[in-house]
Amino acid sequence: MYGIYIHDELTINDTELSMDKLCSGIVENQSKCIAVSINSSNIISDLNMSVRKIIYKFGTNRYLFYYYNSKWYTDIHHILSLMDLSLGSFISELQKYYPECDLTMWILRGDGMCIHRKLIDLETMTKIILSFNSNFTRCFKAECIYHMAIVYILIMYQIYILSLIRINT
């Protein structure tokens, strides 16, 4: 993938907190409700799992990814919060896409709060993004086309260079 990877823990923590705030308190409220109703050993076992967080900056957009068991995931709440939805539509879309969550786990946020994340893989993330017609989606599509064009140009340039080498030999 072309873009910038951000590994700085402070930037990741700030981004994660601000993305959770975009979700109108839903992430924190759901986490608190779930935490009250389950055995705390479930939370502790999830927190002991190794989950790496990374930000991927692609064009003007930032994505927070969670790396677990050799796979990349993102929080469904974060993706839907980028779609300019009203609170009612946000909740409706969450209910629609919850069955596609690949993984749910407790992850410690930078401010010390345990958050119950509903994680989706990159394929599901792309499917969700492309199913909307928001400013974010239009920007995402334009940036994908731009990067594909750059890759195409680089491949054609390599073919041209190889043809020159072949002619000279």
UniProtKB/Swiss-Prot annotation:
Chain ranges for the short sequence motif Cell attachment site as given in the UniProt record: 109-111
Main localisation: membrane
Keyword Chaperone: no
Glycosylation sites: N13, N29, N39, N48, N135
Protein name according to UniProt: Uncharacterized protein L536
Membrane topology annotation: Single-pass membrane protein
S-S pairs: none
Localization in the cell: Membrane
Keyword list, A-Z: Glycoprotein, Membrane, Transmembrane, Transmembrane helix
Source superkingdom: Viruses
Transmembrane segments: 145-165
GO cellular component: membrane
Organism of derivation: Acanthamoeba polyphaga mimivirus (APMV)
